[in-house]
Amino acid sequence: MSSSSEPTKFKMVVVGAGGVGKSALTIQLIQNHFVEDYDPTIEDSYIKQVVVDGAICILDILDTAGQEEYSAMREHYMRTGEGFLCIFAVTSLKSFQEIDNFRTQALRVKDADKVPMVLVGNKVDLPKRDVSTKDGNDKALSFGIPYVETSAKTKQGVEEAFFTLVREILADRRNQEGQKKSDSKRAKFKCTLL
């Protein structure tokens, strides 16, 4: 991160099917509070200052609607995001299967083969699981992204999920910087054959 004491900003977008706990996870991180009632989100924005790996970070988190009818709005929000938390409920196989669509949408909107992303299996505090830890790990491995299991209710893994995304965004920024330097070196040393 930056060597100065100036906080670094990270624009995150939280995506996933309706009812998987996107808002509950975000509110748990921001306000240290668990929301019991399900109130479908259209769009909410949150900002929180945290310390990740000794550096001050500003998390700018956009909590999006999971319902399909808001897909066009979600695309607009995805354009501004640097990284994505793709959340499913371990109690819902359907929400797990829908993650592929959210990932594909993010890649298409960002016009990239890879974007900073973390797969999050939420609601691990509930006794009935339809998605195993192995299934979550396997999907994350196939995407080439980290996997974190969480519970908005017990706080398990909440910071880990968001902080892992910070690290993924940082790695992507470093990779892009390295690519720019490499491209500029190639531009400076062109050979001319006579």
Curated annotation (Swiss-Prot):
SUPFAM superfamilies: P-loop containing nucleoside triphosphate hydrolases
Lipid-modified residues, S-geranylgeranyl cysteine kind: 191
Residues that coordinate or bind GTP: 16-23, 63-67, 122-125
Catalytic activities: GTP + H2O = GDP + phosphate + H(+)
Keyword Membrane: yes
Gene3D superfamilies: P-loop containing nucleotide triphosphate hydrolases (3.40.50.300)
SMART domains: RAB, RAN, RAS, RHO
InterPro entries named among the record's database cross-references: P-loop_NTPase (IPR027417), Small_GTP-bd (IPR005225), Small_GTPase (IPR001806), Small_GTPase_Ras-type (IPR020849)
S-S bridge residues: none
Residue positions where Cysteine methyl ester is found in the record: 191
Notes on how activity is controlled: Alternates between an inactive form bound to GDP and an active form bound to GTP. Activated by a guanine nucleotide-exchange factor (GEF) and inactivated by a GTPase-activating protein (GAP).
Motif Effector region: positions: 38-46
Subcellular location, record wording: Cell membrane
Chain's role: Ras proteins bind GDP/GTP and possess intrinsic GTPase activity.
UniProt family annotation: Belongs to the small GTPase superfamily. Ras family.
Protein name, per record: Ras-like protein RAS1
Species for this entry: Hydra vulgaris (Hydra)
